């Protein structure tokens, strides 16, 4: 933990992440979409609801019985069944029962023909999207363990302690940071790809590249060839720049065993391009060599150019990849005019840098973020995400081994089943408790309002 890192007031005040913080995020998301928010109640099954709500227009049956849309089941039924007119002689009470009949007829056909289900849904497409993307992907890593960020001491607590002031905040007894986590909980670039790439098939302005991996970075030879693996990246960028249907190019980055990510907007301002970087540990402008193209987003959401900071003459090793990558991107993208970096720290402890990046990229594609203000709102929305929430969303956006018996069973299951892993249940518990708190608060506000109206009415009557 570096004491030059900036943090948001909600973290310095140690507002409970699972309480006040989650409640604020839930409430703000309902007020003209002030913040971006993934509502966990929509992610309670193995269906990839983010895809289905875009392509499955049957509200009654979407995400029920099977993740395959009913209209595509009807197409398959007509293609595969010997007597497709048979269904027209059956009187179904509702579309759910109709979908149930279609599904089990097709499933029996696949079993009788000894057709592998996973191969089948990988090869078949509906509205241009493979059926395999209509279910969530399987999480090969372990679920991570972490605590609410309000339980951790902050740099300001440390400074308070130095001058004899006891810790101040909603949680007055902060705990020490725990030991390092087991690598079995680390996400892979494949996990990020499986979660984000399918969304780019719905909102097609976004192009996703699988990974830029830094094996090493030589301070004296800051060239891509000496430090970075990015197989076929240049070819992808050339195609992207020629493709008028694509505006954003995004990719995760691994450097020093830490995930960060970058999103490039080729139409940031007319013919100018911009690169948005996100780091759950934050960037420290004072430790990065001066660059006139670098812009830093502070915890109060102001954006400052690099010249406003007393920066080091040589970039610290922790951020050296930025200099390498910005030079390289500037070359292959034919000049990038602005590079934006968040200065604020979100991740205190957990092994969930991958999940922080998934949430950042998920917000962008799912909410179709494009404008400068929307990106600024995106960085603000991330301020509500800490170790606990990032860890909990792992249980919502993926299927884990705690939800189904094995990966083989997962691959060969077409039916809808409920998510039951502890991380998802933890998230739902937060949702329930904080929804009740909001309703109780709203009830108190209503009582105050009604009392005010009654008093005002009585006052008017007494003056008549």
From Swiss-Prot:
The active site is at 258, 269, 353. Its main location: virion. Transmembrane segments: none annotated. SUPFAM superfamilies: Cysteine proteinases. Keywords: Hydrolase, Late protein, Protease, Thiol protease, Virion. One of its GO terms (biological process) is proteolysis. InterPro entries: Papain-like_cys_pep_sf, Peptidase_C57. The keyword Hydrolase applies. It is found in: Virion. Pfam families: Peptidase_C57. Late protein responsible for processing most or all of the viral core and membrane proteins known to undergo morphogenesis-associated proteolysis. These proteolytic events are involved in the transformation of immature virions (IV) into mature virions (MV). Belongs to the peptidase C57 family. This is Core protease I7 homolog. It comes from Amsacta moorei entomopoxvirus.
């Amino acid at each position: 933990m570096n004491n030059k890192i900036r943090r948001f007031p909600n973290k310095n005040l140690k507002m409970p992440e699972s309480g006040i913080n989650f409640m604020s995020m839930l409430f703000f998301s309902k007020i003209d979409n002030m913040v971006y928010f993934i509502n966990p109640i929509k992610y309670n099954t193995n269906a990839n609801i983010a895809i289905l709500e875009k392509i499955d227009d049957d509200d009654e049956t979407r995400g029920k019985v099977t993740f395959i849309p009913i209209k595509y089941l009807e197409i398959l039924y007509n293609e595969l069944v010997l007597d497709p007119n048979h269904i027209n002689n059956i009187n179904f009470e509702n579309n759910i029962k109709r979908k149930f009949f279609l599904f089990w007829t097709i499933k029996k056909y696949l079993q009788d023909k000894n057709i592998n289900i996973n191969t089948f849904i990988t090869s078949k497409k509906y509205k241009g999207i493979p059926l395999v993307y209509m279910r969530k992907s399987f999480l090969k890593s372990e679920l991570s363990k972490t605590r609410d960020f309000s339980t951790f001491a902050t740099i300001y607590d440390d400074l308070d302690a130095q001058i004899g002031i006891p810790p101040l905040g909603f949680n007055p007894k902060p705990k020490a940071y725990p030991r390092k986590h087991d690598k079995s909980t680390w996400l892979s670039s494949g996990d990020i790809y499986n979660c984000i790439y399918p969304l780019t098939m719905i909102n097609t302005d976004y192009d996703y590249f699988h990974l830029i991996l830094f094996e090493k970075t030589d301070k004296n030879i800051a060239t891509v060839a000496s430090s970075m693996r990015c197989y076929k990246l240049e070819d992808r960028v050339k195609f992207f720049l020629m493709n008028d249907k694509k505006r954003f190019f995004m990719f995760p980055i691994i450097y020093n065993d830490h995930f960060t990510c970058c999103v490039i907007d080729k139409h940031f301002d007319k013919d100018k391009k911009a690169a948005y970087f996100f780091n759950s540990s934050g960037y420290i402008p004072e430790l990065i060599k001066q660059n006139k193209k670098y812009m830093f987003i502070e915890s109060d959401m102001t954006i400052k150019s690099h010249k406003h900071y007393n920066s080091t003459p040589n970039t610290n090793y922790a951020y050296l990849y930025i200099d390498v990558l910005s030079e390289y991107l500037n070359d292959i993208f034919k000049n990038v005019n602005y590079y934006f970096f968040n200065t604020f720290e979100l991740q205190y402890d957990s092994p969930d840098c991958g999940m922080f990046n998934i949430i950042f990229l998920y917000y962008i594609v799912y909410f179709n973020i494009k404008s400068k203000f929307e990106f600024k709102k995106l960085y603000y929305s991330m301020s509500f995400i800490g170790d606990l929430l990032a860890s909990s969303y792992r249980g919502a956006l993926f299927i884990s081994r705690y939800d189904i018996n094995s990966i083989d069973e997962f691959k060969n299951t077409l039916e809808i089943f409920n998510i039951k892993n502890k991380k998802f249940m933890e998230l739902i518990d937060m949702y329930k408790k904080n929804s009740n708190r909001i309703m109780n608060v709203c009830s108190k506000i209503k009582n105050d309002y009604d009392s005010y109206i009654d008093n005002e009415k009585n006052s008017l009557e007494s003056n008549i």
